[in-house]
Amino acid sequence: MRGLRLARQDALEKIFALYAACVRWMNEVSIHQWNDTDYLSAYPPDDYADMQRRGLLFVLEGENGALLGAVVLLPEDERWNGRPSRRAWYVHNLVTAIGASGAGKAILREAEKLAKPHGMEVMRLDCADDNTRLNAWYESQGYFPCGTCIDGPYNGILREKLL
């Protein structure tokens, strides 16, 4: 796998296709998260185009140039309001290609590497509170629970990793 890099505008269609494929896969394997929250309407292609223009959308590619995953790294997140203030990047919209073993772990590690030279102290993310498998995976990656959030129908666990 190549390192994480800023997404180019010409990759936006392929990036959004990853999210659509992930939602279909969740339906097929009965995982209830993005597919139950109208995710593709909540985060339409224009949102990703905006994140790309702002330098917040990143991609992970394979050695052959194939798109393996994408992530948005935000400098702030209102779900964390009222929490201890630390210099943080907020991981959002992390997606991997179906079958791209190790891509999610690689995205997190590469994002963490990028964060340090920018003076970040922590990486933060949230995960649906009823997705026990994904919460366990995030914990295995060093992202520990430190609170909860509610955003409309979404109930999440706030997770943080010290860098």
Residues of each region from the PLM?
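A short beta-loop-alpha structural element at the N-terminal edge
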Residues: 2-18, 24-26
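Conserved GNAT-fold acetyl-CoA-binding loop/helix
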Residues: 20-47
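A short helix-loop-beta-strand connector motif used in the catalytic cores of GNAT acetyltransferases and
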Residues: 43-59
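Conserved beta-strand in the GNAT
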Residues: 59, 66-75, 90, 95
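A short, internal acetyl-CoA/4′-phosphopantetheine-binding micro-motif in the GNAT/acyltransferase core
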Residues: 91-102, 128
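Conserved acetyl-CoA-binding loop-helix of GNAT-fold acetyltransferases
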Residues: 101-113, 136-140
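Conserved GNAT acetyl-CoA-binding A-motif
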Residues: 115-127
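Conserved beta-strand-loop-alpha-helix junction that forms the acyl-donor binding cleft
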Residues: 125-135, 151-154
